[in-house]
C-alpha cells in the first residue's frame, strides 16, 4: 500500500500561551508541524528560547527563527524601550482602545513569512494563535483581517494561482482565555514553560501587563492552577 503523503503545516510560535496551544491543536489535527518564530526586535526575546523548547516538547518536525527588525520603525512599547508597557488596564479600557503594545503591521508581516515558508515546504496550511475574545484589542487579531489575508494569499502565490490556496487556521479565535487554557491542558501543553509577558523581569512574568492579566484571568476562570511565577502577586 502506498504511503499516505504527510500533511504539513506552518505554525507561528511565539512561545506564549496562545501560540503554544495552537501548536498542540495542529498536532492533534494530524499535521507535521513546522514551527516559525520571528525575532522582530521585541523587548521580550526570552519567549524565543521558550518557543524552541516547546516545539520539541510538542513533537514539531522543526523550528526556525527568522529575524525581521520591526524595532527599526518603533511605534510600539514592545519594540521601543522608551515607551512604557501599560500595566493594570481594566477590561473596559482593553475593549475601548488599541494600546501602545500594538506593533504596526506585525501580524501581516508574520503571516507573510509563514506564507513564504509554507509555499517552499509545499504546505497549504498555516496555524496562528490569534484570539478576538480575551485580547488586547489589536486590529490584526480579528476575523476580517484573517479572511482578507487568506484572499491575498490566494492571488499572491504560485500555489494559489495553480489552485492550491493557503488555508489559515485560527482555532482559538473565538475562545475565551479560560477556554484556551482548558483546551491546551487537555492536549498536554506544558504551560509552565510558556512566557506570555510583555515586560518580563529576569525571565519572570511581571504579572500586571495586559498579557499577564489575561493569562491569570484565564487560569482562574478555568479553575486550573496557574504554574506561572509572577513578579507582582
From Swiss-Prot:
GO terms for biological process: queuosine biosynthetic process. It catalyses: 7-carboxy-7-deazaguanine + NH4(+) + ATP = 7-cyano-7-deazaguanine + ADP + phosphate + H2O + H(+). Binds 1 zinc ion per subunit. NCBIfam families: 7-cyano-7-deazaguanine synthase QueC. ATP binds at residues 13-23. SUPFAM superfamilies: Adenine nucleotide alpha hydrolases-like. Catalyzes the ATP-dependent conversion of 7-carboxy-7-deazaguanine (CDG) to 7-cyano-7-deazaguanine (preQ(0)). Keywords: ATP-binding, Ligase, Metal-binding, Nucleotide-binding, Queuosine biosynthesis, Zinc. Its cofactor is Zn(2+). This is 7-cyano-7-deazaguanine synthase. The keyword Metal-binding applies. Belongs to the QueC family. Pathway: Purine metabolism; 7-cyano-7-deazaguanine biosynthesis. Its EC number is 6.3.4.20. Pfam families: QueC (PF06508). It is an enzyme of class 6 (ligase). GO terms for molecular function: ATP binding; ligase activity, forming carbon-nitrogen bonds; zinc ion binding. The gene is queC. Zn(2+) binds at residues 197, 206, 209, 212.
Amino acid at each position: 500500500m502506498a504511503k499516505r503523503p504527510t500533511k504539513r503545516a506552518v505554525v507561528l510560535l511565539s512561545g506564549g500561551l496562545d501560540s503554544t496551544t495552537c501548536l498542540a491543536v495542529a498536532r492533534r489535527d494530524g499535521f507535521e508541524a513546522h514551527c516559525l518564530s520571528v525575532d522582530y526586535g521585541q523587548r521580550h526575546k526570552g519567549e524565543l528560547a521558550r518557543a524552541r523548547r516547546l516545539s520539541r516538547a510538542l513533537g514539531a518536525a522543526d523550528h526556525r527563527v527568522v529575524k525581521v527588525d520591526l524595532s527599526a520603525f518603533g511605534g510600539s512599547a514592545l519594540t521601543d524601550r522608551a515607551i512604557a508597557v501599560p500595566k493594570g488596564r481594566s477590561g473596559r479600557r482593553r475593549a475601548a482602545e488599541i494600546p501602545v503594545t500594538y506593533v504596526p503591521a506585525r501580524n501581516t508581516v508574520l503571516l507573510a513569512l509563514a506564507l513564504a515558508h509554507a509555499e517552499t515546504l509545499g504546505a497549504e496550511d498555516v496555524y496562528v494563535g490569534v484570539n478576538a475574545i480575551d485580547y488586547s484589542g489589536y486590529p490584526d487579531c480579528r476575523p476580517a483581517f484573517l479572511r482578507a489575508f487568506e484572499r491575498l494569499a490566494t492571488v499572491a502565490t504560485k500555489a494559489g494561482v495553480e489552485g492550491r490556496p493557503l488555508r489559515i487556521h485560527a482555532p482559538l479565535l473565538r475562545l475565551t482565555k479560560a477556554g484556551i487554557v482548558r483546551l491546551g491542558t487537555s492536549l498536554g501543553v506544558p504551560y509552565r514553560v510558556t512566557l506570555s509577558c510583555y515586560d518580563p523581569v529576569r525571565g519572570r512574568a511581571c504579572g500586571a501587563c495586559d498579557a499577564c492579566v489575561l493569562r491569570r484571568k484565564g487560569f482562574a476562570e478555568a479553575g486550573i492552577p496557574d504554574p506561572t511565577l509572577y513578579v507582582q502577586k
